[in-house]
Amino acid sequence: MEDETLEDGPEEEEEDEEEGTAEETNQDVTERDEEEEAEKDEEEDKEEEEEAEKEEPPPHMPLSEEMLRDGLSLLCKTGNGLAHAYVKLEVKERELTDISVLQSFIHLRYVDLSQNSLQDLSPLGALTHLLSLRADHNQLVSVSGLGELPYLQVASFAQNRIKSLQGFGHPRLETLNLIGNELRDLEGLECSNLSSLHTLELRSNQLLSTAGLNLPSLRELYLGQNNISRLEGLEALVNLTTLHLRDNQLESLDGFSEHLQALQYLNLRSNMVAKLQEVQKLYCLPRLRALVLRENPCEEEEGYRMETLIALPQLERLDKDFFEEEEKREAAETKKAREEEMAEPGEKGN
């Protein structure tokens, strides 16, 4: 089992729409933004429904034999190759509150318990062969009870009530989805516990800062729809290629680091950046190719596109539109003329 890989581990449902690589067409970008708007509306509707459900505790509903019969699938050989066992379980929308019976199903590799009423996942700590775990839309306030699952690669706990990540650590975890929880800080996200993590979804939480992201292996980070007003601790994200910060409270772009050498896509849409000169603070990002700044006050400044390109000549796209070759030439000429003009007083003095 040690060399087992996640063959059908599903990708994060919502992350592709935000990646925004430089190869995208304008149509791709437009379609992705439209999907994101519809998805955001859907999430808000679900949150309202869940708030109404929080008032009274759910009735006790254990996982029954009938539910197990309906949910088990994918018969495979066990680790020693001498027997067979079901390795996949899907039990959704059954109002489950108790899954203690699963402690004995040690061969399970793929588990989906989404849309139930679970508050405790600790019985799954016995499933040491688990590769993929989904428990979206439950009533979890913590995920520390899982212990360490040595082979877990995909985990999704979207739309719960998780307030803390203390004690959460799985050495082979690659993708973690925590959309729509109640996290106020990122304490507990340590490299020593999550050394393989490359995609982290934290949209729609209550984060105030980015401090605590000590995850050098991370490549994609989604922090949209939070309350972030300060960018801190980003210097540890040396392999990050995609950073999504839409719908936050950023007024300045302080906090970006020259250590972010791999960053290619940055989404700052719908923040509070008032001055276009803040863009100059992104010059330390040598591989930045796509920048989204629309719905910030600075978008209204005269020469918005041209001044951004002058400050960041490596950019290929601003918001939805790619830069034309003519724009790039004009920006380069304008920058050169300004530099020569600034140098003239010194030359005259000599």
Curated annotation (Swiss-Prot):
Compositionally biased residues, Acidic residues: 1-54
Domain LRRCT: 296-334
Record keywords, A-Z: Cell projection, Cilium, Coiled coil, Cytoplasm, Cytoskeleton, Flagellum, Leucine-rich repeat, Repeat
A Pfam family hit: LRR_9
Entry keyword Coiled coil: yes
SMART domains the record matches: LRR_SD22 (SM00365), LRR_TYP (SM00369)
Coiled coil: 314-344
Compartments, record wording: Cytoplasm, Cytoskeleton, Flagellum axoneme; Cytoplasm
Record-linked Gene3D superfamilies: Ribonuclease Inhibitor (3.80.10.10)
GO cellular component, one term: cytoplasm
LRR repeat ranges per the UniProt record: 107-128, 129-150, 151-171, 172-193, 196-216, 217-238, 239-260, 262-283
Main location: cytoplasm
InterPro entries tied to this protein: Leu-rich_rpt, Leu-rich_rpt_typical-subtyp, LRR_dom_sf, SDS22/Internalin_LRR
Region (Disordered): 1-64, 325-350
Identification of the protein by name: Leucine-rich repeat-containing protein 23
Gene source species: Xenopus tropicalis
